[in-house]
Amino acid sequence: MATNITWHPNLTYDERKALRKQDGCTIWLTGLSASGKSTIACALEQLLLQKNLSAYRLDGDNIRFGLNKDLGFSEKDRNENIRRISEVSKLFADSCAISITSFISPYRVDRDRARELHKEAGLKFIEIFVDVPLEVAEQRDPKGLYKKAREGVIKEFTGISAPYEAPKAPELHLRTDQKTVEECATIIYEYLISEKIIRKHL
C-alpha cells in the first residue's frame, strides 16, 4: 500500500442508517457452479426491492466483464477475485445497502477473510451455502461448463479439476435440489428479519 495517501472520513454509518431506515450487510452466496446462487440472488434482490429495501447484487460472471476482467481462474487469481469483491461488498454494506454476492468462492480462507473484513468494520456478514450434489449440478449444467471440464477443455474447474471447500458453519445452508428458488429467497428474507437487519414489511 502507498504511504502518501490519507483516509478521508465521510458520513457515519448511523447517519446513513437513519436515512435508509435499514441496516447494511453482505449476503455471501457460495457453492458449486449451477448450484443456484445467481438465480437465488436475483429472486432475493427482487423480493427486497418489492419491500422497498435497498439491495444490490454482485454476480460472479458480471464482475468478470469489468472490475475483474484482468483475472483468470488460477488459485492466485481466484484469491484476488474474492479479495476485490469483499472490499466492494463491504462498501455497499457500509452504505446501508444489502449487498448480495453470488460467487463460487471455493476457498474457505478467502471467505473467512471476507468475513473478518466486515467484522473489523462492524458490518454483518451472512455466509450462505448454496448446496447441491455434484451430479445434480452436472445434470443442470446450463452453460455446458461441466461437460467441457470433463472433456478437459476447461482447466481448473471447481468441483472437477479444482477443489471446493464447503463452509463449516454458514449462517444458512440451502439445498437447492430440495427447495425452490422462491423458498430459498424467503428463507433468507426471514433470516434478515430474525436478525433485526430489516423490519418485516407487509
Swiss-Prot record:
Alphabetized Pfam families for the sequence: APS_kinase (PF01583)
Gene Ontology molecular function terms on file: adenylylsulfate kinase activity; ATP binding
EC number(s) reported in the record: 2.7.1.25
Class in the EC hierarchy, top level: transferase
UniProt binding sites for ATP: G31, L32, S33, A34, S35, G36, K37, S38
Cellular component, GO annotation: cytoplasm
Domain of life the protein comes from: Eukaryota
CDD domains hit by this protein: APSK (cd02027)
Pathway given in the UniProt record: Sulfur metabolism; hydrogen sulfide biosynthesis; sulfite from sulfate: step 2/3
Coiled coil: none
Matching Gene3D superfamilies: P-loop containing nucleotide triphosphate hydrolases
Active site annotation, chain numbering: S105 (phosphoserine intermediate)
UniProt record, GO biological process: cysteine biosynthetic process; hydrogen sulfide biosynthetic process; methionine biosynthetic process; sulfate assimilation; sulfate assimilation, phosphoadenylyl sulfate reduction by phosphoadenylyl-sulfate reductase (thioredoxin); sulfur amino acid metabolic process
Reactions it catalyzes: adenosine 5'-phosphosulfate + ATP = 3'-phosphoadenylyl sulfate + ADP + H(+)
UniProt entry keywords in alphabetical sequence: Amino-acid biosynthesis, ATP-binding, Cysteine biosynthesis, Kinase, Methionine biosynthesis, Nucleotide-binding, Transferase
UniProt key word Nucleotide-binding: yes
InterPro entries, A to Z: APS_kinase (IPR002891), P-loop_NTPase (IPR027417)
Family to which the UniProt record says this protein belongs: Belongs to the APS kinase family.
Role: Catalyzes the synthesis of activated sulfate.
Note: Present with 2170 molecules/cell in log phase SD medium.
HAMAP family for the chain: Adenylyl_sulf_kinase
Protein name per UniProt: Adenylyl-sulfate kinase
